[in-house]
Curated annotation (Swiss-Prot):
Keywords: Amino-acid transport, Autophagy, Glycoprotein, Membrane, Transmembrane, Transmembrane helix, Transport, Vacuole. This is Autophagy-related protein 22. Residues 338-349 have a biased composition (Acidic residues). Glycans are attached at residues 354, 419. Belongs to the ATG22 family. The chain crosses the membrane at residues 166-186, 232-252, 264-284, 289-309, 395-415, 426-446, 487-507, 524-544, 559-579, 593-613, 632-652, 661-681.
Length: 737
């Protein structure tokens, strides 16, 4: 506190100041210590507007800006608009990450520091608490960016919460919507518009009637002049939706990989899909084809949004604090366990330094400072894969918890409203509302994580820019396919995933239709199948990591164990063809209750496959090409699902029943094991990083440090990161052959 004599009061506080008027009596001020830069107990004389200084070097820093009521109001107004900015700003950043919407303490601190520091006395720009995000200055504590706008800030807990929030919002659609009530509703609406196969003059009865399993009870409906079995109507609808989904994710992959569109597109598809699901409340018997159209749009939007969500996973892992603390900026092979002195501190040479000191790299170590070994590439790969699996499995588990809760709510609605199509439409409306509402936290907390800028010859906008992005995306896809052929483990994974994802999607829809049409289960009983499956999925999502550690299984070995359990489902259905099993009257899916233990197996297996496949593939992707390679992942996933439901639908049309489709399911479930068996994660990661250097023309951040090249290599990395590099932009396939 200042020692004051006279009428003028001049107080210094950490957050505000009241200045003396421009005129007034001379005031003798005795400054107390404010910063280490100023001496204590120095007398200064205040004479009106100017201060007489005996020594100009003792002049204190400029007074901070007056923090008035208007400043409070300005901050309150800015804080009240945070959520609105999250949806409308060009950056679409999380509230706590926006430089213009800092927290109260950060705003005050950066404002005061910018005005009180003599070094910044002439700088009127707003401070950024996370450091400069463009120059890669090591003083900011952040890794140097690989391209302009690269967000190298560590992954925060709020950002992870935003990623989990979207899984919590959208998984209910695939569990309760497309995996349960949408195929049930589509089959019911098609049957209400269909006629009997044996007598086309008679309308179909309810699918719960026992005679519908016979040839006389089969029901057909005419769609665009084609005769389709009502049980296969939903299967064909899904085939069309995944075909469009595959085309869509390719077209948006460029916009997701380049620029700042990844998060915007995710939210756009989320709200389009949720709106379509809520629109089922208006669907009736006469508009059943519109119901199929809503299923196509919603499923396409869901798939596209999840491709974009998956593309965040490698970025969250790469910038996670547990990965960043490896010590890339330390000496080769070793890193200190504690942070050294600040760069502004004067380095005092120690008399104990000798000829070996120069070998320690560019960092300065105090005598006796403990050293710890930096992780090798193989250890880092193992740690990143473990962290990726944990995050992925946790996201799956959170989504399953949401699906389980909403499935119980749906069953209560169905029982209360007597299992009518109206009750099914209400359930779907609730599912869509859930999807839309819980997407809001993801919009607020998830960072955009922009990619490299797209190389363009001129500044284009509007429709021309959209057309340019789409054309570039398809060109990039073919380049990505060409590049993926060089990555043995990527090829092996995608070949296995092509069949495995088809088996997952087709088994779910086939089982629901089999239970409804062959076992004559009520909608609430069908909902119980999903409740059991979802509960088992939660258990599987959190149990497979324990199982893999207990038996020391690698990621691809855990996937093989899941496939082995998965194969039991179609094999059990085929047991119904055995004469002695038919004589028992139970077993081989002859009784409705048999669906429940199989649902438990399916959910437990899916809980492991969903997390491990996604994280395993993420480790094999060349850094910087996440959205492009996840688009290829989605094409393999959803593109294969075009064939599965269509083949099952053709089997139903040809045979009049669903059980023969289990032969097809048994084949596509078991075959992927042949490809997954030969995957080597360490080899795939090394090849991916090497390919990333060819694609983007840069060395991975910290790679030279890990390999022992020291400060010189790090300086080269920093110099190489100044220029903008576009993924696949300047890559010449012919030259690399």
């Amino acid at each position: 506190m200042a020692k004051i004599s006279g009428l003028c009061v001049f107080k210094w506080y950490p957050l505000y100041a009241y200045q003396c008027p421009a005129t007034g009596p001379s005031v003798q001020l005795k400054y107390s210590a404010m910063t280490p830069r100023h001496n204590n107990n120095v007398n200064h004389v205040y004479n009106g507007p100017d201060i007489q200084w005996e020594d100009e070097s003792l002049r204190p820093p400029p007074a901070p800006r007056l923090f008035s009521r208007s400043s409070y109001a300005s901050y309150a107004s800015k804080a009240s608009k945070r959520s609105f900015y999250s949806y409308t700003s060009s950056c679409f950043e999380a509230d706590d990450e926006r430089s213009d919407t800092l927290s109260f303490a950060d705003w005050i601190t950066t404002t005061m520091s910018g005005r009180m520091s003599p070094a910044n006395a002439g700088d009127n720009s707003d401070s950024y608490p996370y450091g400069d995000d463009t120059d890669g200055d090591s003083s900011s504590g952040l890794p140097p960016p690989r391209y302009p706008g690269d967000d190298t800030r560590p992954t925060s807990q709020k950002e992870l919460a935003g990623w989990y929030a979207y899984a919590f919002a959208a998984e209910v659609y695939v569990i309760c919507g497309i995996g349960s009530f949408i195929p049930i509703l589509l089959e019911s609406l098609a049957r209400e518009n269909g006629v009997l196969l044996s007598d086309r003059s008679k309308p179909c009865g309810s699918s719960s009637d026992k005679h519908t399993t016979s040839a006389e009870g089969q029901c057909v409906v005419y769609v665009l002049g084609m005769e389709i079995n009502t049980a296969s109507f939903a299967m064909y609808t899904f085939s069309v939706s995944v075909l469009l989904q595959a085309l869509l994710v390719v077209s948006i992959s460029c916009a997701a990989d380049h620029g700042n569109f990844r998060k915007k597109l995710l939210l756009a598809f989320a709200w389009i899909g949720s709106a379509c699901v809520m629109a089922y409340i208006f669907i009736s018997k006469s508009t059943y084809l519109i119901g199929a159209l809503l299923a196509i749009i919603s499923n396409t939007s869901f798939g596209a949004s999840f491709v974009l969500l998956n593309s965040f996973l490698p970025l969250l892992v790469r910038h996670h604090p547990e990965i960043d603390q490896v010590g890339d900026y330390g000496s080769p092979g070793y890193a200190t366990t504690e942070e050294g002195d600040d760069e502004d501190d004067e380095y005092q040479e120690d008399s104990t330094r000798n000829s070996t000191t120069a070998l320690l790299g560019s960092r300065r170590y105090e005598e006796g400072e403990p050293l710890s070994r930096v992780q090798t590439t193989e250890e880092l790969t193992s740690r990143e894969l473990e962290l990726s699996t944990q995050i992925s499995a946790k996201g799956i588990g959170i989504g399953y918890i949401a699906g389980l809760f909403l499935q119980c709510v749906a069953i209560a609605i169905l029982i209360t409203l007597k299992n009518t199509t109206w009750s099914q439409r209400i359930v779907l409306c609730v599912i869509g509302a859930w999807w839309a509402i819980f997407t809001i936290p993801a919009a607020m907390w998830l960072r955009p994580r922009p990619g490299p800028p797209l190389p363009t010859k001129s500044n284009t906008g509007g429709i021309r820019a959209l057309f340019h992005y789409t054309i570039y995306a398809w060109k990039s896809l073919f380049r990505t396919i060409h590049l993926a052929r060089r990555l043995v483990d990527i090829v092996l994974f995608l070949a296995g995933w092509f069949l495995l994802s088809d088996a997952i999607a087709t088994t779910s829809s086939t089982a629901i239709l089999f239970a409804k049409t062959q076992l004559h289960m009520e909608p609430w009983a069908l909902g119980m199948i999903n409740v059991i499956s979802t509960a088992s999925g939660i258990l599987g999502a959190f149990s497979w990591s324990f199982i893999s550690r207990k038996f020391r299984l690698k990621a691809h070995q855990t996937i093989l164990a899941c496939i082995a359990l998965f194969e039991l489902i179609p094999l059990y259905g085929l047991m119904g063809y055995l004469p002695f099993v038919q004589a028992w009257g139970v077993g081989g899916l002859q009784q409705p209750w048999e669906m429940y233990p199989l649902a438990a197996i399916y959910g437990f297996v899916l809980g492991g496959l969903s997390g491990y496949c996604r994280s395993l593939y993420g480790e094999l992707i060349p850094p910087g090409s996440e959205a492009a390679f996840y688009a290829l992942y989605a094409i393999t996933d959803k593109g294969s699902s075009v064939f599965g439901p269509a083949i099952v639908g053709a089997i139903i049309d040809a045979s009049g029943e669903i059980r023969p489709a289990f032969w097809f399911l048994a084949a596509i479930v078991g075959t992927p094991a042949l490809f997954i068996w030969f995957i080597n994660v360490e080899r795939g990661r090394t090849e991916g990083e090497a390919l990333a250097e060819i694609i983007e023309g840069f060395k991975m951040n910290g790679q030279n440090g890990l390999n022992g090249n020291g400060a010189d290599g790090l300086a080269d990395d920093r110099r190489g990161s100044d220029a903008s590099r576009a993924i696949l932009g300047r890559y010449d396939d012919e030259d690399e052959e």
